[in-house]
Structures are given as C-alpha cells and as structure tokens.
From Swiss-Prot:
Regulation affecting activity: Subject to complex allosteric regulation. The enzyme can assume an active R-state, or an inactive T-state. Intermediate conformations may exist. AMP acts as an allosteric inhibitor. Fructose 2,6-bisphosphate acts as a competitive inhibitor. Strongly inhibited by Ca(2+).
Name of the gene: FBP2
Higher taxonomy: Eukaryota, Metazoa, Chordata, Craniata, Vertebrata
Necessary cofactors: Mg(2+)
Binding-site list for substrate: 122, 213-216, 245-249, 265, 275
One Gene Ontology cellular component: nucleus
Protein name, entry field: Fructose-1,6-bisphosphatase isozyme 2
UniProt pathway: Carbohydrate biosynthesis; gluconeogenesis
Organism: Oryctolagus cuniculus
Catalytic activity: beta-D-fructose 1,6-bisphosphate + H2O = beta-D-fructose 6-phosphate + phosphate
Keywords in alphabetical order: Allosteric enzyme, Calcium, Carbohydrate metabolism, Cell junction, Cytoplasm, Gluconeogenesis, Hydrolase, Magnesium, Metal-binding, Nucleus, Phosphoprotein
Amino acid sequence: MTDRSPFETDMLTLTRYVMEKGRQAKGTGELTQLLNSMLTAIKAISSAVRKAGLAHLYGIAGTVNVTGDEVKKLDVLSNALVINMLQSSYSTCVLVSEENKEAIITAKERRGKYVVCFDPLDGSSNIDCLASIGTIFAIYRKTTEDEPSDKDALQPGRNIVAAGYALYGSATLVALSTGQGVDLFMLDPALGEFVLVEKDVKIKKKGKIFSLNEGYAKYFDAATTEYVQKKKFPEDGSAPYGARYVGSMVADVHRTLVYGGIFLYPANQKSPKGKLRLLYECNPVAYIIEQAGGLATTGTQPVLDVKPESIHQRVPLILGSPDDVQEYLACVQKNQAGR
C-alpha cells in the first residue's frame, strides 16, 4: 500500500492520532471533529496546489486582502475550503481568516465551542514560482457565554488548545501540537492519509543558520544589525552562520524547527509594529516552536504572552533555537541600555 513496506497493518494515521488524543482527554469529540475537518481542507488544498498550473489557478484574482496583500486565485479557493469544512464540523463559533476583514460567525444551527484563527495559504506570493507554501491554524476555546464575536478571538497564544501548520513542499507535511509536544505527519498519496513520521520533535539548542530578509537591512534597528553582523563575522573565530530565506514563513519556520537556528521578522523603520499577523501567523508557529523546546519572542516579550487588541494585529517575530534567540535578546537589551 505504501512505499515503505509491502503492506502496513498498524500505521498511526493523523485521523487515528486525533481520535486517540481525544479519548485520552475524555473529551466530547468536538475537537476531534474540528481537527479532522481541518485535515480534510488541508488535503483538498494540497491537491489544488499540485494541480494549480493545469487548472489555471496561478495568477492574481484582481483584489487585495484586508492586510494589503494581492489575493491569488488559490488563496480564494483555499479560504473557501477551510471556512466550509470548519463550519460544517459543528464545532466552531468564530473563525478569523487572513482573507476576511471581519471575523466569521458560524450560524447558530452549526455552532460549537471553538474559535479558529487561520491563514489558508501562507506565502502565496510564491505560488507562481512553485516555492513551498502552507496553511497555518490555531484553535482556542470560547471563554464567555456571550453571543460569539471577534472578541472571542482576542486571546493570548497561551490559551491555544491545538495549533499546527501544513507545508506544501516536495511532500505535504503537517506539524501538530495539542500541548504535549510536536508530532510530524506526511501525506501518503497512496492512502490519501497523513501518517506519523516523527514523534515529539525537539529543536536543537543552537543552530548554524539565520533566516531573515536582508533586503530590508537599510531599515533594521541597531540590535538586528548587530546580531546579523555577529552571525556573518563571528568575533570568536568560529564559522559564520549560513543564510537561508525562502520568503514563505511556513517553509522558513519548518526549516528552523528541523535544522535549528533562528528566524527573524523584526520590527523595522518601515514596519515599526512588525509585519506578520499575531493571531494566525505568529501565535500558531510560536506555539509549535515552544512545544519543541525553542523560544519565540517579539523582542520585548514572548509572542504567546501578547494580549491581542485587534484580529489583524501585527507583531515582530523572532523564533528558533533557545541559545540563538537568547543571543538576539542580549543584543536588544545591550542596545536599549546604551540609549
């Protein structure tokens, strides 16, 4: 059935994994339904991404989304897929998408207790050149008895119940955490199922790669400039860090998780509040990185401690191996002390 052996009789699929986690937590099954619906959407998006050129899904849809990005045709399709799958899971009450200006409130007859924040297709500016892209999501419980509203999504990342991302690269991968470490699943095309490939992934304490868009060096603050200089021209005589930057956050974050090192999208003169969105970009990946033993910071506080004020709020993001992030924070503190 798969290429790994003639026939596997006891494989741990992601569907089975999600059901087992729900059983262990003695839950109602609502989160299980929700995660399985999210996975169905991810499989459908994966299929659409693979067929995009043939189905004329490349190119621009002719609109700009609420955060100022050009909307690609695949973005529109992916957004509709995720919204429809999540609402038909009967487990959500509020959805926040990068593509929608307002929060989406699930109809009463389909309503559940979970809030989902997601970016249906992160890195979609890379679609036309076939670079890796992804889907990112974070799931929260509704904490009030009030009628659902966008306020239900304004929770710090510490409240996340489950989070993950899908990476549509040379294969389709899902990284998922329900608060007990990070597990990686690969889509087996022969089965149409995600199969566990790595359990309880841990990030290296220190890496050898730094990842940021150096094209913005003109706008960097003193701390970022100093840190990058240290990585390129180490004062202790050690080898310089390698530079890697795809420009698709899911791809850059996943490489950082697997190989170690640091990913930076700091505030700069052009984007003083940062560029990446807190609810559906920064929080989910910060949660995954922390669950894997890494650190994720805005430069002034852990990303997961930020109390959101609006659903499309932007924050700086620096994440990766703990020693590397601490070294960056030391540069920040040194430059603040020197002011």
